[in-house]
Curated annotation (Swiss-Prot):
Function: The SPT4-SPT5 complex mediates both activation and inhibition of transcription elongation, and plays a role in pre-mRNA processing. This complex seems to be important for the stability of the RNA polymerase II elongation machinery on the chromatin template but not for the inherent ability of this machinery to translocate down the gene.
Annotated GO MF terms: mRNA binding; structural constituent of ribosome
GO CC term (a single one): ribosome
Organism, scientific name: Kluyveromyces lactis (strain ATCC 8585 / CBS 2359 / DSM 70799 / NBRC 1267 / NRRL Y-1140 / WM37) (Yeast)
Regions of compositional bias (Gly residues) in chain numbering: 892-902, 966-975, 1026-1036
Keywords, sorted A to Z: mRNA processing, Nucleus, Transcription
Organism lineage string: Eukaryota, Fungi, Dikarya, Ascomycota, Saccharomycotina
Disordered: annotated segments: 1-189, 383-403, 892-919, 966-1036
Name of this chain's protein: Transcription elongation factor SPT5
Pfam family, one: KOW4_SPT5
Family the UniProt entry places it in: Belongs to the SPT5 family.
Amino acid sequence: MSGTAEESDKAEAVSVPETVSGSVESQDKEHNSTSSSSDSTDVVGGKKRTIDEVDGSSENNSASVDQLKDAPTDSKPKTEATEDSPIRGNQGNNQENSQENKDDEDDEDDNDDDDNDDDDDEDEDVESYRKKQRRERNRFLDIEAEVSEDEDDEEDEEDSELVREGFITRGDEEDEEDRGGRVDDRLHRELDQNLQKTADEDMHKIAEDFKKRYGRDSSKDYRVQTQGGYVPQRFMLPSVDTAIIWSVRCRPGKEKELVRKLLNKKFNLDKSMGSKKLKILSIFQRDNYTGRIYIEAPKQSVIEKFVNGVPDVYSNQKLLIPVQELPLLLKPTKSDEVRLDVGSYVRIKRGIYKNDLAVIDQISQNNLEALLKIVPRLDYGKNDEIDPDTNQRKAKRATFASRPPPQLFNPTMALRLDQANLFKRDDRHFTYRKEDYVDGYLFKSFKIQYLDTKNIQPTVEELSRFGSKEGDVDLAAIAQTMKKAQASKAMFQPGDRVEVLTGEQRGSRGVVTRSSKDVISVKLSGFSDKSLEFPIASLRKIFELGDHVTVIAGEHEGNAGLVLLVQNGQVTFVSDQTRENLTISANNLSKSMDSTPTSSEYALHDIVELSAKNVACVIQAGHDIFKIIDDSGKVATVTKGSILAKINVARAKVAAVDGNGREIKIGDVVREKIGSRREGQVLYVQNQHIFIRSKTITENAGVFVVNPMNVEAVASKENLMSSALDLSKINPNIASKMGPPQTTQQTRLVGRDVALNKTVRIRSAGYKGQLGIVKDVNGDKATIELHSKNKHITIDKRKLTYFSHEGGEGITYDELVSRRGRTPHTRLGPSYVSAPRHMAAGGAVATNTPQQLPGGMTPGWNAFDGGKTPAVGQNGGTSSWGGASTWGGQGPGGASAWGGAAGNTSTWGGQGATSTWGGASTWGNKSSYGGASSWAASGESGAASAWGGGNKSSYGGTSTWGGNQGGVSAWGGSGNKSQRSKNTGGSSTWGNNQSQHNSGERSAWGNASQHNNSGNRSAWGNQDARGGGSTWGGNN
């Protein structure tokens, strides 16, 4: 059987299942025949065949086997074939071939004895075939005939398993599956052919279109020139025959987005329109022409129809590009765009995260947006506003000026301060205020146009925020790399002291003589005068303690300060602007002579104006960014553009009232009444807050803000100036010219505003004409309680008219301040009457001591005998200050302007020689420098002068400070006695009419003169200034 299998493989490897019975081996064993192939027999259909016959028949039947494979099999074969063998046709062919072969008849005669045995075996085989069912055919495996019956059961199990696995199909299903498979193959081949044909047609069509548009085959010159491999530029230039390019206005920054959008629109329109295509040839934009997109089309109407309804495109603003400008428009330029990849670093251009570093996590398919990984800036609702009506939290939109510092998201803080807006997705993912936070980072989408992708140089601090948690960033390596990069970009100037770090001159020091881009010339100390050249990376600047340096590169560029420490190439200095210690690489510093803590336009502790109502104090000055503390005490960082102006404190006239009612002004020293009792100098006063600078506090550059009612004044500039000693009072040259001592001036009111509790009338719009009372004053604002209704309003105190409690004529605030808060009183009589009606207009009230008059009346001491304002019916005859009026006297020149009707009437007194101040007239007796004493007794002719002798000059005669011949001593008695003597007859300047020790002494403050001689006429009413005539119009 093995030989049969091998020969069948040679015969075109055609498998004929079950053509050989399994009884061959049993026949060989029973007869013990020879091993030759001729002795072996095969039983098919009850007849014997040799293997040679089988070999011959196999070759002849190769075609029939192929026909059997291709021909479909019936599920029910013929009856004869079923009884004899599964394949009856092959057996019949084998029998015919065996009959024709007559050469083997001798062998058949030799084996006649075995016919009976073979018949028995054949019967058994037929019975076994009848019992067996038709087995499934295998399409994939070539299964040979089995000779052993013991393995039939195993075959059935194996075949059934193969059927289940799908390797073998049943015979009844084979025809349908084969037919369906052939149909599928045919359809697939047809589809592939159609696709290939369509693709070929499209390629030919596209080639023809390009040939029509850009082909130059019709140009003979072009073909001739291109044969040599050179094409002149004039053939590449556009002409009037080419398509027309139109420039269309669009929103700046949307150019690339609109090009992609219009291109998709063009494709969609082409699909919907079928064979009729839209005549749009190209759409492009140029980076150097912002706000413009370019469309290539033959007609303007096509463009209008194409861009109609597209947002951000201004279709009515189109411009035809001239032919001569097309080459410049289409000239290729090197693009400076950076390819964006996942993981690239970018910076945000706008919003609260402006200039913050971010990492690209995802990029959209249209390359217009990117999902960024950002370090969040959150305050967790600390600055939110609460609506008083609904009592609901209203999120305050953060701005760049008031943004919080960058920190990773803290779910614990969010849960404690703003639980309502926090949602937990998992242990790593949180949603807070509609934004996603994963592992503490914010993931947010931004448009590409709002990202800065060029020259991104992250700092070590920024990189540590992104990589320190995962440990995937080597900060030490990055720092070393940045140091090398900074060293390569170091700036050396002639005169800088440097140290050599590498090479043979390592450790040597010298001075830079010349600098270039890469090489520095240094003159080393201890070497020859010749300068040596060194690369920049091998040099380092040298600074000494106490040097004043300025940062010339890096994050703190522009800062200046005093060097405190130099170690390992790092310089630590205290900043003049922030008063903080900064450590900078030595190569990024430069020695400077300027130590002024000024940066840009604003300096440290400057008072700046943020808005019309808000001011702030600069506590840290930079070039473009400033750190301030506002009037509410909040510390914020603002840009230079956020500051409106600088307030000139020297010209500011602002004040406040402390807790003790004293006035506080700029420059005063105050101390807190409660709390830490901080003390400092007032920098500025703003509404209900004052800015104070303390020298003992380092926080916020020593500036803090408090309410003025919580402080008390320690020292005031005005108080110190007013309490200073006036040396001019003891100057004898000035004292000799001084007039009589004046009454004690009223102490100036300090602290309490003069407008407080005054009745006022409003002069500004809104409440004009209404009356009220001042309840509180704060700076320039006054709180008024209206009389008409129970309402308090705040208004400028200079827009009020102030009245007394009785009414009368109103005055302004400045007049009220000049009057020390006294308002004019009302009178029962006419307004020009100075005294009440119960005082007689001409009555004389002679008293020796001064009296305090009620109200604000002008008359002084003993002035009621003729010293009133002219009354009605007097025709101006009575002087408003004394006797007869100058303007209403009897004769021209006869009456004194300040005196009485007669020439000898005293200005300040009553009649004649009556002194204004009580005794003899100050200006009455003889000369103003030598007449009767202003302070002596009256009634004497040419009484003793206070400053001179009896009838002598004020610079002669009696000494003011001693007793000389010719007059009475001013300080002593009369008759050449000492001023301190107690002799009789001496008229004391400070005495009374009659002393206890001296008889006849008369006081300068004493009574009126008892004598009416011509010597005691008033200096203001006598005939001559040195005699008796009045200087203001006395008698001739």
